[in-house]
Amino acid sequence: MAGQDAGCGRGGDDYSEDEGDSSVSRAAVEVFGKLKDLNCPFLEGLYITEPKTIQELLCSPSEYRLEILEWMCTRVWPSLQDRFSSLKGVPTEVKIQEMTKLGHELMLCAPDDQELLKGCACAQKQLHFMDQLLDTIRSLTIGCSSCSSLMEHFEDTREKNEALLGELFSSPHLQMLLNPECDPWPLDMQPLLNKQSDDWQWASASAKSEEEEKLAELARQLQESAAKLHALRTEYFAQHEQGAAAGAADISTLDQKLRLVTSDFHQLILAFLQVYDDELGECCQRPGPDLHPCGPIIQATHQNLTSYSQLLQVVMAVADTSAKAVETVKKQQGEQICWGGSSSVMSLATKMNELMEK
């Protein structure tokens, strides 16, 4: 996207203003043609051929342009249609945020590049974004032509990628590249390389032994924390089965213990990550893993677990209240009570029978 931003300025060294406008007009016509090829429903009955008019349609802020972008986003990610349907009546900014989020996940724009979706960015940048989005739709359409659903297409692509990687890593050519028979270094460099290799192996061995000791200590502390957590869990369920209401103080103490163990576990994980980043990472000869950000999934899982915990607390409170109510009713049924102004003493059940006979 940086290249597109650089091409949006006026008075460049390589192209004149007229040539820039001409290239933008051609790009607009190409994007318009791709939209027609994909049977965009918002272009039905629309007959325009003038490049300037097409550019104004695709690059000027309007509700019509926003509907075309919404259609393109739903073609890339069909489940987004349900999200848009639930957002009817809300400000347009919310839909723009959703489309910007999708564009960022597809690595087509920045996470805060909402001006691009609104149509306030330069025309060349907007057309480049639309062109890449349309290419994504076309690739999905071609890939899904032999599959009955989008998920089957993704599954088929994953299997093909795994087969390709397996073939690549099992190929003899890869092993020859990793372990060449002929040393590429000249002879006068060999003694220096051997010395550096010996020094590195010695330093690596000593560092590895230290890291193994640290890892063993961290593993031991982690096992102790896990044992404490298991003991607390067993204690909690034992108290729950006995039906002994420990009271708010006991629950608070148990909660504090769980928080303390969780905090210790968190500190151990942070220490392990610090050791790995600072010292273990230097000994590894492979790049670090490419982790995909799953923040929204973790946040949604945390919210679901919180709601489930609150629901369990409500159920426990209702169960305790119901048990107390039943116990109170049982006591009153067998207890002799004076009813009204009468001096006679009788139980609740006897009084009810007397009223029914009347």
From Swiss-Prot:
Stated role: Contributes to mitotic spindle assembly, maintenance of centrosome integrity and completion of cytokinesis as part of the HAUS augmin-like complex.
Gene coding for it: HAUS7
Subunit structure comment from the entry: Component of the HAUS augmin-like complex. The complex interacts with the gamma-tubulin ring complex and this interaction is required for spindle assembly. Interacts with UCHL5. Interacts with EML3 (phosphorylated at 'Thr-881').
Lineage: superkingdom: Eukaryota
Residues annotated as signal peptide: none
GO biological process, one term: spindle assembly
Residue ranges, compositional bias (Gly residues): 1-10
Protein name: HAUS augmin-like complex subunit 7
GO cellular component terms, A-Z: centrosome; ciliary basal body; cytosol; HAUS complex; mitotic spindle microtubule; nucleolus; plasma membrane
Keyword Cell division: yes
Cellular localization per UniProt: Cytoplasm, Cytoskeleton, Microtubule organizing center, Centrosome; Cytoplasm, Cytoskeleton, Spindle
Keywords: Cell cycle, Cell division, Coiled coil, Cytoplasm, Cytoskeleton, Microtubule, Mitosis, Phosphoprotein
MF annotations from Gene Ontology: microtubule minus-end binding; thioesterase binding
Taxonomic source organism: Homo sapiens
Family: Belongs to the HAUS7 family.
